[in-house]
Each structure stands twice: as C-alpha cells, then as structure tokens.
C-alpha cells in the first residue's frame, strides 16, 4: 500500500479536552483505504464505524515546516474537495480513549470517500464560510461551516506541516490532506446511506 494522504483529528477544543490533549492528532491515508463517491462500503469490514464530513486539500506543491502559515497552505493547494471519512476504532473501549490510543490507532482512521469535484481556490472562495448539509437516509441530520475547523480549514493543514517538520517530514505534492471534521461523527449501521452537500 502507498501513502496518498494525511489526516488530522481532534481539531475541536471540545474533543481535545475529552481525550486530554492540547493539540490535534494526525495519521496517514493509504491508497487501499480510499473510495470514490457512490461506492458501497461493507459495514461489517469495520469494528466501530462512524462517519463525518470534511474538506480535503489537494497539494500542488510541497509544504515544509516550520513556519508554514494559512497563506502558504492556500498557495500550495491545487484545489479543495468534499470528503467523507468513515472513522474506525480498534481499541477495546472506543468510548473511553486516550491520546495514546488514538496515536496507536492511526488517529482512528478507517476509510475515506472522496468527492468527485476539485474546486480551485480563487479570491472569491472563503473556506471559513463554506456551508454544508449532511444527510442520513435522505434526512438532514447536521450542518456546519468551515469556520468550525480551527477557525479556518487551512489552519490544521498548516499545523500539520509544522508538526511534521519536528520529525523531519513534510506534506508532499500530489498528496491530499483531510482538515478535520465539520460535523460530529455519526454511528454507521449496515444499509445506511449518507450524503454531504456543500455550497
């Protein structure tokens, strides 16, 4: 398997306080965990599946910290796209996890469903104001805007580039970065369908 993306988790202050951390966590995305929109996913292939909506950043340039800013992220981004993450947890009690559990569990990474439209960034797109409705079996169950992801979805991407620099690593051209959940994670059961609509 090949690394094709990176994920950032625990981007909200509430989630950080819940697991006793002061910053997000992060993990990798492998190519065999990525699906196109509309492709069914077997619920029984996962242990504790939960789904959430995120904004993805597709990089056209490397991002090497330290000192990466939101503006650097925007300049290095070919475009943004909607995605759904089906998180999974392989720890004994997924309702009571610590940051150590999350790190060992690849930031509760499961599978990723990529939206089919890449939107180039332009001066009239403010990621903080991008709105989203989240549907479960045809009924809207949640909504949100980009500002709910650390104030700006590009902020956690900058954070990750700077964090990786501490380990001599970088975000690479051609990878995508998942910026963190706009919605709370919803439990998934077999037979369910989910849809996210952005405006």
Predicted features along the sequence, with ranges:
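Catalytic-core "active-site belt" of small-molecule-metabolizing enzymes
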Residues: 1-150, 193, 199
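A conserved acidic, glycine/proline-rich C-terminal tail/linker
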Residues: 157-189
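Alpha-helical scaffold segments in soluble metabolic enzymes
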Residues: 58, 79, 113, 155, ...
């Amino acid at each position: 398997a090949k690394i094709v993306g990176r994920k950032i988790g625990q981007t909200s202050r509430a989630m950080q306080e819940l697991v006793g951390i002061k910053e997000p966590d992060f993990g990798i995305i492998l190519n065999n965990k990525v699906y196109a929109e509309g492709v069914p996913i077997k619920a029984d292939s996962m242990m504790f599946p939960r789904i959430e909506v995120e904004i993805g950043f597709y990089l056209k340039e490397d991002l090497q910290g330290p000192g990466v800013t939101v503006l650097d992220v925007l300049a290095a981004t070919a475009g943004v796209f909607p995605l759904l993450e089906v998180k999974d947890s392989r720890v004994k009690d997924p309702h009571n996890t610590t940051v150590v559990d999350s790190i060992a569990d690849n930031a509760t990474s499961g599978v990723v469903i990529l939206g089919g439209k890449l939107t180039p960034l332009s001066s009239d797109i403010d990621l903080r104001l991008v709105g989203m409705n989240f549907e479960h079996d045809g009924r809207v169950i949640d909504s949100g805007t980009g500002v709910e992801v650390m104030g700006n979805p590009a902020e956690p991407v900058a954070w990750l580039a700077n964090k990786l620099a501490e380990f001599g690593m970088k975000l690479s051209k051609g990878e995508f970065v998942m910026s963190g959940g706009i919605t709370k994670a919803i439990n998934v059961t077999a037979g369910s369908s989910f849809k996210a609509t952005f405006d």
